[in-house]
Amino acid sequence: MPFEIWHGLEDGERLSLTQEAFWSFSQHFQLAKDDQSDLNPGNSIVVDQLEEARLKAKGLAINLSGIMTALDLLTPPANTPLGSVPLGDSVFERKCRGYVIIRDYSFWTDRAVTFLGELKAKYSE
């Protein structure tokens, strides 16, 4: 979503989109973790890092729901869990999928930090 559109949204809309994004990331990290386990079965370090990221994304989504409830905003329904939809079975496609998940997670994390800082300043007054 372009910067101009994002900043044109109301706080509730931005909270909702951010909550949905991190709930989705918690599910996508599970996919990446499963891929990594298959691609490198002897390397638990990356799998452990993906699990940690999955739990953090899920925790943030839950906390964002709490913020929305505290502000009397409707919380979006939980996303439909990802199924076993074929997203590419080659090693290259699976590695690319992991890269895209990490790249987008980084983008949304930066966006969330900035937005939540603005929200804190706004509601702390």
Where are the regions that the model predicts?
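Long, contiguous alpha-helical bundle segments
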Residues: M1-R103, F107-E125
